[in-house]
Structure formats: structure tokens, C-alpha cells
Swiss-Prot record:
Ranges spanned by the short sequence motif DEAD box, renumbered to the chain: 581-584
Residues reported to bind ATP: A468, K469, T470, G471, S472, G473, K474, T475
Region annotated Disordered, chain positions: 1-279, 299-358, 816-868
Ranges of Basic residues composition bias in the record: 118-131
EC number: 3.6.4.13
Motif (Q motif): 424-452
Lineage: Eukaryota, Viridiplantae, Streptophyta, Embryophyta, Tracheophyta
UniProt comment concerning the protein's domains: The Q motif is unique to and characteristic of the DEAD box family of RNA helicases and controls ATP binding and hydrolysis.
Keyword hit for Cell inner membrane: no
Enzymatic class: hydrolase
Protein name stated in the entry: DEAD-box ATP-dependent RNA helicase 42
Coiled coil regions in record: 1012-1037
Organism whose genome encodes this protein: Oryza sativa subsp. japonica
One GO location term (cellular component): nucleus
Length: 1049
């Protein structure tokens, strides 16, 4: 029993202990929670205190900023007030000087009048005594008294006139002061209102930002034309007062009616202006009052009568021309200015003599002509190293038979003297170790055929022409030697031009070559820049200024860069390695002038390399002009399709091609990328739309798209974002797209070389490819090229294609058809003497065809739209027709009467010539009567003719679109018509380049007609200036290159 009690008590004891522990632990937890909550409360209070302190600090900072801004505003106001006081003081001084000058001028005029009266009295007295010596003295004394009275009367008139002029000047100055005070008060109120609004907003920084534009605006307005409310009405009052004073014999205030020039173009008041702004009263004094004082000082003393007054005004007007010449484009002067035309006569002397043909040549100067030719004899070029190739022993030991067999194995053909032997491995090329490591990393195991032969030739410093099939590694064949060549020369510093220059015909090819070079140049520390149109020129210019060893470019944009800033951006003096990729297109007639001009600006001892997959003979003749003893390399045949490409040509009409394309897409869409070629931009977009409707996502690429769209399209196509691309021939050259399995020529290529490059987009770098070409019976003229391509690449020729080509060649032999061109010798004007002569000859032939007889004495400027009298040509034709009719009547009458005529001219002397014949037969009488009738009709026409006016024409059809839009817009034509008084209308029809103008049609031109010859000349000169500005803007600002036909909205 006792043990059970003990056990129970111990159990209770343990339970109590556990309860105590639980209470203590719960108390401990409560204390800890209480401490944690109190600490959180303290932290919260600390954060609130910090936030309050930050707010106080920000508030104090804002108050300091506000005080600082107010202090700055007060200081600015003090400076403004000080400036106003200084201006008022200067104005008072100028007013005093002006009054003193006027008084001196009036006193001098008075003295001269007195001297003139004294001389007149002396002459009259001398004349009186000479003829009437015997007259009594009484009348002579009376005459002297009358003369004294006249002198006193003249002096009173002069004094009255002087007082009126002084009063008018004082009133004018008072009016100006009142307006200036009103303007200053208005400006001060505006500034206070703005400052009050900014203070209410409580943003100090914005107040500082708003004060600066307001101050700049006030300064800008001060330099502009100053007009206040009521200015025009007061000016009209001044004009009436000036007219009244002119009627009274003075010319003091008559010039006040001229409006204030823009910006104060006079030099008299330039020293009195502050550097930051132009005071309106200063501008008025400099442009109005001081010139009037100069006029009064330069005027002759006696200008009492109207005739002398008029001549003096003319002298003053002519004297104003001696200032600095004004150029076209200034603010159009007011209608009341009599010297509007006279101010620019000297400026336009040259432009009037310049005919429209010379103007077109000057304005439409090509890019190649804008790049000046360098005289290499005056430049001291530094020598450089060309030959880096050392033949290894394994290659040296090869016998001639072994070399020939190896070349045959590589399908190589070489032409030239001492051609190096082809290499077998990369190590034998003579490249640096860094280049060899990069080649190994990129996975190039051994050189391809063109590389095996081109590398030793180019590394030896020889010029070469490389002709290899598409996808054969031509880019690497010239990039690797160029990198070795550049690395051997001194480093490029900012301001130097590139050492290596690569030119390509398309922008996409430039981007691709640039990306290939970047793979190697980064390891060597060489900078490479891509220069091409359609993209921002600012970044390209900045990269060139930093220095670039290699430049990859299109010729047009490169010439733009070379011409910009007079050649200060970059130059070609250091170019020692020149490459032209796709050289056959580079030397086509469209590119040849630009290429030639760039080549002429590089040093003569450079190394030049040309590569292409096709190279016709006629283009090779042009290309060899820039080469020195070149070596020609051919891989396979010349202009031959790669044998790894399976070619299929199908004769299909236009309406069956789309369904056949869908069938091909269903078969090849999942195998790889597909490229479809069409012949035009419209066809490209329409086919894109049709494929989208049939569920095929695709991309389009053509020259009408923006450059950014073209780059993103190619990037998406190469990166498998989309595997179907529809393109024009802009994608036919040089583009390397991995896994491109099928090429479809939806429209047949228009020449053989284009076909080779199109199908060469597949089957690259040893891969197999497939190409399908559609041709219809209407396109039979292109069938022989397709047969040639298939035969040269050892492909089977379909029977229907062979029959199509045979039928066309039979028609050619019969003369009913003409074989199409080679696709070379493109368009593009050269603007040289030959084209000028051809144009003139064609124009003369057309004139003869329509029965017009040109005047031998007329110059081209008269023919090409010079100013002429309206109706002058019609009157001349009427007179010529009348004379011809009279001659025919006289000749017929004379032949009927069996009379001999000795002259063919029957002009105004025709009646006298006919009347001199003594035989009064009936035929002679009829001829005489006909001549008289014609002359009477001409006299009647001239009597009822319209008033004489002048007209001219200015052709604008061939100018860029922005220039045509600007020159035909009313915002441009309106001020010119108002200024010159000539009417300008747009006539004719716009004809794109290459479109033939019809017989009864005219190209787009401006027709100018006016009441005077001078007005028409001035209007035409101003129109030419606007066109020239637009043309220069298009050529000299390559960043604004013309966009294509399409744009993405």
C-alpha cells in the first residue's frame, strides 16, 4: 500500500514538473514574442523616423533649389534690366547722333542752296549788265530786292520742310519706343506667369529646364522679323506721309515703307548688337534710319525739282547693290520693294547663260564623277610587301607531269606565266599559325580546288582571275591571303584608309563576306567594316573614323563615303589589296564607271584579285584593264553549273506553274530549305500571298524592301525560322545558305549567267542539290540557254525543251526572230559627250521626221527651253508658211508662163520682185494678188494678237521622287510665283526610266510664263536652285538613300 502511494505521489510530482516546464516554456515564448513585437515596433518607428528625415532633407533640398532658381531668375532679371538700360542709353546716343547728322545735312543743303542762288544771281547780273548797260539804276535795285525776297521765301520753305521732317522722325521714334515698352512688358508678364506656374508645381528642376527654352525663344524672336500689333497700319500711315512729302519735293520719309529684313542683314549695326540676341530697335535703326542718313549724305545738294529728286532716288537704289550679295533662298521681299529683281541680277548672270542641258549635267552628276581622280605622281607611297609564299619541299619536288595530273584531278585550268603549283594541305599555304588554328577550329580539313591553286598565286603577290563553280569556296580563297597581307603592314591609325578593299554587287553578299571575315579577324586583332546602302550611315562613318584594316562595300555607298566631307572620313591611299567578288557583274556597264573611278583612286602597284562563278569574254576584256599580268584560274568549265546539282526543266504554261509548285512543296517541304525565284517584285509579293492562302509559311526578298527587312529575312531563312523563301535575282549571287535542298525557277532566267547563279544556291560545298525550272512556249527565246546549261553540266536535255530551242533557232536563221542579249551591258547613264551627241542627233532626226526645219543659228540653250516670247514660234511658222505659199504660187505661175526665176527667196520683197517683171500676164497677177492677201492676213493676225508675254520650260521627269514632289508642291511654287510674278504650271506625264515616250506625249515638265523676260528668268533660276538642292541632298547624304518600291507599314 505504501509503495503504491509513493508511486502515485511521484507520478503527481512528475506531472507537476511537466506542467511547470510547460508554463515556463510558454512564458518564455510569450516573452520572446513580446520582445520580437517590441523590436518590430522599434524598427517600424526607426523606419518612420528615417523616412521623415528623408522627407525633411528632400523638402530642404527643394527649398534650396527653389531659392537658387529664384535667385537666378532675379539675377537674370537684373541682367535684363541692365541690358535694357544700356540699350536705351545707346538708343538715345544714336538718336542724338541722328539728329545732329540731319541738322548738319540740312545745314550743308542750305549752304549749297545759298551758294547756288548766289551763283544764279551772279550769272543773271552778269547777263543783265552785258546786254543792258544803258538802263537806269532804278530797275536794277528793284530786281535785287525781288531776288532777296525770293531767297528769304526759299529759306522759309526749307526751314518748314526741315521742321516737318524732324517732327515726323520724332513721332516715328516715339512710336517705336512705345511698342518696345509694350513688347518688353508683355514678355516680362509671360515670364512671371511661367515662373508662378512652375513654383506652384513645386518641381525645381523643371523650372530650370523651362526657363532656358523661354529665354532661347525670346532671343530667337528678337532675331526674327519684328512685328507687333498695329505695325502694318502704322506703316501704311508712314507710306502716305512719305508720298505727301515726296509731292512737296522731299524724300525723307518715303523709304520708311520697306519691311524689316529677316535677321538684320546690314553691317552698320552689327557692332551694336549683343552676342546672344538682337534688339528690335537696333534692327530697325540699322535697317531703316541709318541707310536713310547715308542717302541724305550722298544725295546732291539741289534736288528741288521732280526730275532731280527721281534721279537721286535711283542713285540711292543702285547704291544699295554695293553691299554683300544675297543668295537665292532668302526671305521673299515685299511687293512694295522696287529693287527686288535688281538685287540679284549680278548673281544670276551665270545661271542665265547656263542652258538646261548644262544644268542637268551639273545637277545629275553621277557618283563616279563626284569622286575626283587622284594624281599618283604627286603622292609618295610607302613600299609594301606582296610575296609571302615560300614553296615547301613536297611541292617543289613535284614534277610537271605530277602537277598536271593533280590539276586534272582538281579540274583546274590555269593561264599565265610561271604559275605556282597547287598545294595539298593548309600548312603548305604559308599562312600564320593563328589563321591555321582558326581554320582547324572551323572544321576545314583540306583546301578545295579553287583554294588549292588560288592561295599560292595570291600569296605570291600575283593578280589573278578566279572562275569557279558556285559553292566552291571562293570567298576563303581571297580572305585568307588578304588577312596575311594586312597583318604584315603597319597598324592603321584613326584617319587612315583601309589596307584591304572588297567590293561586291549586292548588299546581302557584302554582309555575308563581312561575317566570314569576322570569323578570322577577331583572332588576329584586325578590324573589318561593312559599307553598304540602305542602312544607317552614321555608324559606318564612326567605324571608319576609328580605323579599319579591311572594308567590304558596295561601290555606290563607298563613293558616297569617299565624297562626304571632301574625303575627310576615309581615303584609298593605303589600299594595297583590292578584291572584286562576282566580278562579272561588277564590270557590267551599270557598275563599270563607279568601279573604274574607285580603282583609279587606289595606288597603281596594288594587288588586284577578281572572283566569280561566271565570266563572259566581253566582260573579261573590261576587267583586264585593272589587272597587271594576271593569272586566270578555272575550276571546271567557264560559266558551268555545278555537276552535283540535278537540273530539271519543264515546259509549262503560266496557269499550270502554281499547282506544280504546290506539288514540289509537298514533296520537298520537310526535307530542307526551298528557294523560289521570280522575275519581278510584284510577282514575288503576289506569289507570297498565294502560298500563305494555301497554308505554306514563307518569306519574300527583293530590292524593293528596306535593308533591315532584307537582313532579317535572310537571317530567318538561314536560322530555320522559315524554310521557304521567294526572291528575285537579288538573292542569286554569292549567298551561302546551309541545307538548301531545292531551287525552283518559277520564272525562267532571262540570260545564261543568271541561270547558273540561281541554281548554284543549292549543291554547295560538295552537297547534292536539285533545281527545277519552268518555261513556256512564249518564252522560247530562253530555251537555247537552258539547253546549253544542261549540256555543259552533262545533264539530260528533255525532248520538248530541245524542240522548243530548235524552233526558235530556226526562226532566228530565217530572220523572223532575234536572239536575246547576254544580260550584260546594263542600263545607266554615263553623262559623257557621246551620250550628249547621240541625244542631239536623235532629237534632230525626230524633228526632221515630223517636218520641222531647225534653225542653224539657234544654240542648244535656245532649243532646250530658254526664255522665249509666247506665240513667237507660231508667228514665225505662220510667216514661213506664208512665204512658202507665196513662193509656190509664184513658182507655179512662172512655170506655166515658161519664165526663168533666179531666186528662191520670196520674203517681204516678193511683191517688188514680181512687179519688176515686165510681162503682165495672168499668172503673174495671180501670184501678186496671193502674196498681198497673205501679207494682209499676217498684218491682221498681228493686230489682233494677245499682249506680249514670255514663257519657258523646265523638265523635271528624270529627277528623284522627293525632288519632283517638292518642286510641284504649292508650298514651293506659291512664294516663287508671288515673288517673281510668273505663273508656273505642271504639264506632261511622268515616264519611268526606260519607258518610251509616245509621239504625242511629253515628259513631266514645268511651264513658266510671265509678263517680262526677267520674271521668267528669275522663276526658272529659283526652280533650278530647288532642284539642285534636292539632288545634292540625295547624293551627299547617303543615310537618306532612296527606299524601294515597297515599305512595311
Amino acid at each position: 500500500m505504501g509503495s503504491s502511494d509513493e508511486a502515485g505521489s511521484s507520478k503527481h510530482h512528475r506531472r507537476d514538473k511537466e506542467k511547470d516546464r510547460e508554463r515556463s516554456s510558454s512564458r518564455h515564448h510569450r516573452d520572446r514574442d513580446r520582445e520580437r513585437s517590441s523590436s518590430r515596433h522599434h524598427h517600424r518607428e526607426d523606419r518612420d523616423d528615417d523616412r521623415d528625415r528623408d522627407r525633411d532633407r528632400e523638402r530642404r533640398h527643394r527649398e534650396k533649389e527653389r531659392d537658387r532658381e529664384e535667385r537666378k531668375a532675379r539675377e537674370r532679371e537684373e541682367r535684363e534690366k541692365e541690358k535694357e538700360r544700356e540699350r536705351a542709353r545707346r538708343r538715345e546716343e544714336r538718336d542724338r547722333e541722328e539728329r545732329s547728322r540731319r541738322r548738319e545735312a540740312a545745314a550743308e543743303e542750305e549752304e549749297e542752296d545759298v551758294d547756288r542762288d548766289r551763283k544764279r544771281r551772279r550769272r543773271s547780273s552778269h547777263h543783265h549788265h552785258h546786254h543792258r548797260d544803258a538802263e537806269p539804276e532804278g530797275p536794277a535795285s528793284g530786281a535785287r530786292e525781288e531776288e532777296v525776297v525770293d531767297v528769304e521765301e526759299a529759306e522759309r520753305r526749307r526751314q518748314k520742310k526741315k521742321e516737318e521732317e524732324q517732327k515726323q522722325l520724332d513721332e516715328e521714334m516715339e512710336t517705336r519706343r512705345r511698342r518696345i515698352k509694350e513688347w518688353q512688358e508683355m514678355k516680362r508678364r509671360e515670364e512671371e506667369t511661367k515662373r508662378r506656374e512652375q513654383e506652384e508645381a513645386g518641381v525645381g528642376t523643371s523650372a530650370a529646364a523651362a526657363a532656358a527654352p523661354a529665354e532661347a525663344e525670346d532671343g530667337g524672336n528678337a532675331g526674327k522679323k519684328w512685328t507687333l500689333d498695329g505695325e502694318e497700319s502704322d506703316e501704311e500711315g508712314n507710306q502716305e506721309d512719305g508720298k505727301k512729302s515726296d509731292d512737296n519735293g522731299g524724300s525723307g520719309a518715303g523709304a520708311m515703307d520697306v519691311d524689316v529684313p529677316n535677321g538684320g542683314d546690314n553691317a552698320n549695326g552689327a557692332n551694336a548688337m549683343d552676342e546672344d540676341e538682337i534688339d528690335p530697335l537696333d534692327a530697325f535703326m540699322n535697317s531703316m534710319v541709318l541707310p536713310e542718313v547715308a542717302k541724305l549724305e550722298s544725295m546732291p545738294a539741289a534736288n528741288v525739282d521732280d526730275k532731280n529728286d527721281k534721279s537721286a532716288k535711283d542713285a540711292v537704289t543702285n547704291g544699295d547693290k554695293k553691299g554683300p550679295k544675297k543668295v537665292m533662298g532668302r526671305i521673299i521681299q515685299g511687293e512694295d520693294s522696287d529693287s527686288d529683281y535688281a538685287d540679284d541680277e549680278d548673281d544670276e548672270g551665270g545661271s542665265e547663260d547656263e542652258d538646261d542641258e548644262e544644268f542637268m549635267k551639273r545637277v545629275k552628276k553621277t557618283k563616279a564623277e563626284k569622286l575626283a581622280i587622284v594624281d599618283h605622281s604627286k603622292i609618295d607611297y610607302q613600299p609594301f610587301r606582296k610575296n609571302f609564299y615560300i614553296e615547301v619541299k613536297d611541292i617543289t619536288k613535284m614534277a610537271a607531269e605530277e602537277v598536271a595530273a593533280y590539276r586534272k584531278q582538281l579540274e583546274l585550268k590555269v593561264h599565265g606565266k610561271d604559275v605556282p603549283k597547287p598545294i595539298k594541305t593548309w600548312v603548305q599555304s604559308g599562312l600564320t599559325s593563328k589563321l591555321l588554328d582558326t581554320i582547324k577550329k572551323l572544321g576545314f580539313e583540306k583546301p578545295m580546288s579553287i583554294q588549292a591553286q588560288a592561295l599560292p598565286i595570291i600569296m605570291s603577290g600575283r593578280d589573278c582571275i578566279g572562275i569557279a563553280k558556285t559553292g566552291s569556296g571562293k570567298t576563303l580563297a581571297f580572305v585568307l591571303p588578304m588577312l596575311r597581307h594586312v597583318k604584315d603592314q603597319p597598324a592603321v591609325v584613326p584617319g587612315d584608309g583601309p589596307i584591304g578593299l572588297i567590293m561586291a554587287p549586292t548588299r546581302e553578299l557584302v554582309v555575308q563576306i563581312h561575317s566570314d571575315i569576322k570569323k578570322f579577324s577577331k583572332a588576329l586583332g584586325i578590324n573589318c567594316v561593312a559599307i553598304y546602302g540602305g542602312s544607317g550611315v552614321a555608324q559606318q562613318i564612326s567605324e571608319l573614323k576609328r580605323g579599319a584594316e579591311i572594308v567590304v562595300c558596295t561601290p555606290g555607298r563607298m563613293i558616297d563615303i569617299l565624297c562626304t566631307s571632301s574625303g575627310k572620313i576615309t581615303n584609298l591611299r593605303r589600299v594595297t589589296f583590292l578584291v572584286m567578288d562576282e566580278a562579272d557583274r561588277m564590270f557590267d556597264m551599270g557598275f563599270e564607271p563607279q568601279i573604274t573611278r574607285i580603282v583609279q583612286n587606289t595606288r597603281p602597284d596594288r594587288q588586284t584579285v577578281l572572283f566569280s562563278a561566271t565570266f563572259p569574254r566581253q566582260v573579261e576584256i573590261l576587267a583586264r584593264k585593272v589587272l597587271t599580268k594576271p593569272v586566270e584560274i578555272q575550276v571546271g568549265g567557264r560559266s558551268v553549273v555545278n555537276k552535283d546539282i540535278t537540273q530539271l526543266v519543264e515546259v509549262r504554261p503560266e496557269n499550270e506553274r502554281f499547282f506544280r509548285l504546290l506539288e514540289l512543296l509537298g514533296e520537298w517541304f520537310d526535307k530542307g530549305k526551298i528557294l523560289v525565284f521570280v522575275h519581278s517584285q510584284d510577282k514575288c509579293d503576289s506569289l507570297l500571298k498565294d502560298l500563305f492562302q494555301h497554308g505554306y509559311p514563307c518569306l519574300s526578298l527583293h530590292g524593293g524592301k528596306d535593308q533591315t527587312d532584307r537582313e532579317s529575312t535572310l537571317a530567318d531563312f538561314k536560322s530555320n525560322v522559315c524554310s521557304l523563301l521567294i526572291a528575285t535575282s537579288v538573292a542569286a549571287r554569292g549567298l551561302d545558305v546551309k541545307e538548301l535542298e531545292l531551287v525552283v525557277n518559277y520564272d525562267v532566267p532571262n540570260h545564261y549567267e543568271d541561270y547558273v547563279h540561281r541554281v548554284g544556291r543549292t549543291g554547295r560545298a560538295g552537297r547534292k542539290g536539285f533545281a527545277v525550272t519552268f518555261i513556256s512556249e512564249e518564252e522560247e527565246r530562253y530555251a537555247p540557254d537552258l539547253v546549253k546549261a544542261l549540256e555543259l553540266s552533262e545533264q539530260a536535255v528533255p525532248e520538248d525543251l530541245k524542240g522548243l530551242a530548235d524552233r526558235f533557232m530556226a526562226k532566228v536563221k530565217q530572220g523572223t526572230e532575234q536572239a536575246h542579249g547576254t544580260g550584260y551591258g546594263g542600263s545607266g547613264f554615263k553623262f559623257n559627250e557621246e551620250e550628249d551627241e547621240a541625244r542631239k542627233s536623235a532629237k534632230k532626226a525626230q524633228a526632221r521626221e515630223y517636218g520641222y526645219e531647225e534653225d542653224k543659228s539657234d544654240s542648244d540653250s535656245d532649243e532646250e527651253g530658254g526664255v522665249r516670247k509666247a506665240g513667237g514660234d507660231l508667228a514665225a511658222q505662220a510667216i514661213a508658211a506664208a512665204q512658202a505659199a507665196a513662193a509656190m504660187v509664184a513658182a507655179k505661175a512662172a512655170s506655166n508662163a515658161n519664165q526663168q526665176t533666179q531666186g528662191t527667196s520670196v520674203g517681204p520683197l516678193l511683191p517688188l520682185a514680181i512687179a519688176s517683171n515686165t510681162q503682165n500676164n495672168e499668172a503673174t497677177a495671180r501670184a501678186l494678188q496671193a502674196a498681198f492677201n497673205i501679207q494682209q492676213n499676217l498684218a491682221r493676225i498681228q493686230a489682233h494678237a494677245v499682249p506680249e508675254h514670255y514663257e519657258a520650260e523646265l523638265e523635271i521627269n528624270d529627277f528623284p521622287q522627293n525632288a519632283r514632289w517638292k518642286i510641284t508642291h504649292k508650298e514651293t511654287l506659291g512664294p516663287i510665283q508671288e515673288w517673281t510674278g510668273a505663273a508656273i504650271t505642271t504639264r506632261g506625264t511622268f515616264f519611268p526610266q526606260g519607258k518610251i515616250v509616245g509621239a504625242n506625249e511629253r515628259k513631266l515638265y514645268l511651264f513658266i510664263e510671265g509678263p517680262t523676260e526677267l520674271s521668267v528668268k528669275k522663276a526658272k533660276a529659283e526652280l533650278k536652285r530647288v532642284l539642285e538642292d534636292c539632288a545634292n541632298h540625295a547624293l551627299n547624304l547617303p543615310g537618306s538613300a532612296q527606299t524601294g518600291k515597297y515599305s512595311v507599314i
